[in-house]
């Protein structure tokens, strides 16, 4: 599978103070968790990114009740007007502040797929937002930040049901996960090896 090139671009303006918040979701599979709408509303996002495996496109209409939605198709999604990948450009006074490549399948484990890294580099993105694995993840590879929000769809294996947030303040972006069931910050469990 090779990712398409020349993704559509969406330009968004930072708020007057230079702040912006994205809620980030993925892998809804037509059945977002019952608490997901409340959790998203609590975040008060400026926009919502959906990193694919939407399922029924009515899911996007429900998300749009909270904030404008920008989505990409996932591997379970059929043909539609939803693109395979998308560039999100945050600007302030016509100056680019952050460029995000939104794509469904981007990583193998903690490493970016070569085709995704090529597109992100060509498009000068600094952050790749993806879905597919249902595994919440924040990492870096090939000088790019990588963010998988996890899934707010049906539970898969023993994975948590989580969503993500990208908070832009004072020129920097903070990536975080929120437990959809409790509304509390989510961090990976600690493992102690003896």
Model-derived segments and their meaning:
Residues 1-69, 77-97, 159-161, 193-194:
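N-terminal active-site segment of His-dependent metallophosphoesterases
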Residues 28-42, 102-122:
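Pre-active-site segment of Zn-dependent metallo-hydrolases
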Residues 75, 94, 106, 152, ...:
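Short, flexible active-site-adjacent loop segments at beta-strand->alpha-helix junctions, enriched
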């Amino acid at each position: 599978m090779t990712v398409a090139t020349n993704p559509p671009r969406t330009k968004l303006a930072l708020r007057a103070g230079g702040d912006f918040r994205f809620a980030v979701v993925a892998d809804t599979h037509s059945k977002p968790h019952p608490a997901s709408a409340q959790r998203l509303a609590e975040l008060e996002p400026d926009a919502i990114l959906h990193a694919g495996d939407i399922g029924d496109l009515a899911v996007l209409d429900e998300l749009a009740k909270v904030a404008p939605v920008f989505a990409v198709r996932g591997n379970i999604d059929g043909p539609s007007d939803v693109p395979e990948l998308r560039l999100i450009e945050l600007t302030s006074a016509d100056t680019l502040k952050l460029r995000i490549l939104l794509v469904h399948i981007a990583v193998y484990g903690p490493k970016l797929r070569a085709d995704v890294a090529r597109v992100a580099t060509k498009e000068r993105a600094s952050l790749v937002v993806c879905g597919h694995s249902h595994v919440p993840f924040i990492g870096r590879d090939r000088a790019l930040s990588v963010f998988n929000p996890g899934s707010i769809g049906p539970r898969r294996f023993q994975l948590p049901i989580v969503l993500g947030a990208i908070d832009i303040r004072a020129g920097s972006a903070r990536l975080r996960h929120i437990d959809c069931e409790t509304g509390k910050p989510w961090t990976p469990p600690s493992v102690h090896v003896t």
